[in-house]
Amino acid sequence: MKEVVAKKYVKALILSLSSDEFDKLGNELKDISNAFLLPKLKVIIDSPDISSKQKADFLFSLLDNASNKIHNFLLLLAERKRLGLIPEISKEFEYQQAVRDCKFSGLISGNFELSAAQKTELEERFSKKFGAKIEFENIKNNYNGIKIELDDLGVEVSFSIDRLKAQMSEYILKAI
């Protein structure tokens, strides 16, 4: 539910921005969103003793050289008692920024390390396939195979060695 409301705020916010303001506001939202990782901030935001304007002004004070648009946006969110949506709004804004720039990031996970050349080749092939700039982060874990995830594009490709072994065994048993 929070994501749906966040999308509406982001859509309205984007319509009010020029291309120059877009990146700056994205960074400001990201900075405020990172502050939400602190438990004390949640206490301040949820406190009934602090006025909505004071909450918005406090969040605005966390930013250096912030734009007037972010201040007005924070005041609007505070007035509607939706300051708690800022992390979701930031995430959605980041996604919209990626769509605008045709630049997406994904994860490659598996129990082995890919070489830089292999990673670059995968990035180039996926970039060509989707017509966008794709960057991958390589994560080594216990997954016996390889899994490629592009959440923003809704793509997940996986190859499991265990599954391959099971299917080969099943095929051999059927053949006998």
From Swiss-Prot:
How does the record say this protein sits in the membrane? Peripheral membrane protein
Q: Name one GO molecular function term.
A: proton-transporting ATP synthase activity, rotational mechanism
UniProt entry tagged with the keyword Ion transport: yes
**Keyword terms, alphabetized:** ATP synthesis, Cell inner membrane, Cell membrane, CF(1), Hydrogen ion transport, Ion transport, Membrane, Transport
Gene Ontology cellular-component annotations: plasma membrane; proton-transporting ATP synthase complex
Keyword Ion transport assigned: yes
The record's subcellular locations are: Cell inner membrane
Family annotation (InterPro entries): ATP_synth_OSCP/delta_N_sf (IPR026015), ATPase_OSCP/dsu (IPR000711)
Subunit relationships: F-type ATPases have 2 components, F(1) - the catalytic core - and F(0) - the membrane proton channel. F(1) has five subunits: alpha(3), beta(3), gamma(1), delta(1), epsilon(1). F(0) has three main subunits: a(1), b(2) and c(10-14). The alpha and beta chains form an alternating ring which encloses part of the gamma chain. F(1) is attached to F(0) by a central stalk formed by the gamma and epsilon chains, while a peripheral stalk is formed by the delta and b chains.
Q: State the protein's purpose.
A: F(1)F(0) ATP synthase produces ATP from ADP in the presence of a proton or sodium gradient. F-type ATPases consist of two structural domains, F(1) containing the extramembraneous catalytic core and F(0) containing the membrane proton channel, linked together by a central stalk and a peripheral stalk. During catalysis, ATP synthesis in the catalytic domain of F(1) is coupled via a rotary mechanism of the central stalk subunits to proton translocation. This protein is part of the stalk that links CF(0) to CF(1). It either transmits conformational changes from CF(0) to CF(1) or is implicated in proton conduction.
- Tell me the protein family, please: Belongs to the ATPase delta chain family.
Q: Any idea what this protein is called? A: ATP synthase subunit delta
Q: Which organism is it from?
A: Campylobacter fetus subsp. fetus (strain 82-40)
- Gene name of the encoded protein: atpH
